[in-house]
């Protein structure tokens, strides 16, 4: 066990280094061989990675593919939808969504003719409430971008409630599951689009993102970002006979990257082999310890939801100042506790390598550094 509280950044698990090394050594051997086995083997590895994700979130076969990151996934979706679906309508996002996605949508408004509406955080609060998000959501909303778990507060959206409202409004629901998948149970259910990363609680590599598109929506998507791998047969090179694959492969484009998927497979195997419920229980025990101790610390303010069922796997705490937050992170690092901060917000995410003893010691250190 260790003082590692950075699962919101990069996830890890016991034995990760050796297992990833084994996977990458195998890749190196195959990729460097002087024969023609490379691509068949590597594309099979990529397909295995995709199936692992499908199994993890209950997605039907053929509804997922790889992307480099969630920003590219969302861009591919926007460029795939019929013009009349977006033009003159709204895309709804919360003020606590992942900034990269907001940056993207802001830049695409003029070209695609939609208006980006950002639902604000209430005065004096830290995250956008589900009821406020739903309150801003009418039948003129083409896409609702839902952050399942916030990266700044760990607030977890009620996806059942949101999905029900989305169906009533005829809206495409896009769920960003990056900060929650692998540490809380998640199923695609009736959600239209899911984007996510393997980097956090799935203990994988950067570059191993995914996109899921509901089967009924797939048939109307024609991604403008397309290429030879968008086709049923990538080796169909007749310029005049391009056709999209009838499954999620239509969201592929050029030659796919495989290395990130290979480096991430051990983490996916660990999560599926251990069980998300088991990992969630351990995490909930540790995060509840932090929440309880922060509540008794008069110098720190909890910005995550108080109730465990409303949180993801992290606990976010507000320091008195930006300078204090940075100083706390530095001091904790010197004491072998690893966390980070965003402005005044300290972020703590315990996982499978984090023990109760280390969590209690972290809380003791926070008390010492803030209230003496």
Identify the role of each PLM range.
Residues 1-372:
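Pyridoxal 5′-phosphate
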């Amino acid at each position: 066990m260790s003082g590692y509280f950075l699962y919101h950044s990069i996830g890890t698990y016991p034995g990760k280094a050796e297992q990833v090394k084994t996977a990458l050594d195998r890749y190196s051997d195959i990729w460097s061989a002087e024969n023609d086995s490379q691509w068949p083997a590597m594309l099979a590895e990529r397909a295995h990675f995709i199936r692992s994700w499908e199994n993890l979130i209950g997605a039907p076969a053929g509804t997922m593919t790889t992307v480099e990151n969630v920003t590219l996934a969302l861009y591919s979706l926007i460029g795939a939808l019929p013009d009349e679906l977006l033009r003159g309508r709204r895309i709804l996002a919360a003020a606590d969504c992942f900034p990269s996605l907001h940056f993207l949508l802001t830049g695409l408004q003029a070209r695609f003719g939609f208006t980006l509406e950002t639902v604000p955080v209430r005065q004096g609060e830290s995250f956008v409430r589900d009821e406020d998000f739903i309150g801003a959501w009418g039948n003129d909303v083409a896409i609702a971008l839902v952050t399942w778990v916030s990266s700044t507060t760990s607030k977890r959206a009620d996806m059942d409630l949101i999905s029900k409202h989305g169906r009533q409004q005829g809206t495409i629901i896009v769920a960003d599951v990056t900060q929650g998948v692998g540490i809380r149970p998640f199923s695609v259910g009736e959600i239209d689009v899911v984007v996510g990363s393997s980097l956090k609680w799935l203990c994988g590599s950067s570059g191993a993102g995914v996109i899921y598109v509901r089967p009924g929506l797939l048939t109307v998507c024609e991604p403008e970002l397309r290429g030879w791998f968008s086709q049923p047969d990538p080796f169909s090179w007749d310029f005049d006979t391009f056709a999209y694959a009838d499954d999620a492969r239509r969201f592929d484009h050029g030659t796919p990257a495989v290395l990130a998927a290979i480096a991430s497979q051990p983490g996916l195997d660990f999560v599926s082999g251990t069980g998300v419920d088991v990992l969630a229980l351990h995490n909930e025990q540790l995060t509840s310890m932090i929440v309880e101790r922060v509540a008794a610390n008069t110098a720190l303010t909890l910005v995550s939801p108080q109730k465990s069922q409303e949180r993801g796997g992290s606990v976010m705490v507000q320091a008195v100042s930006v300078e204090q937050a940075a100083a706390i992170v530095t001091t904790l690092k010197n004491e072998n506790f690893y966390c980070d901060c965003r402005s005044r917000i300290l972020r703590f995410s315990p996982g499978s390598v984090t023990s109760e003893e280390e969590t209690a010691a972290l809380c003791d250190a926070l008390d010492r550094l803030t209230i003496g």
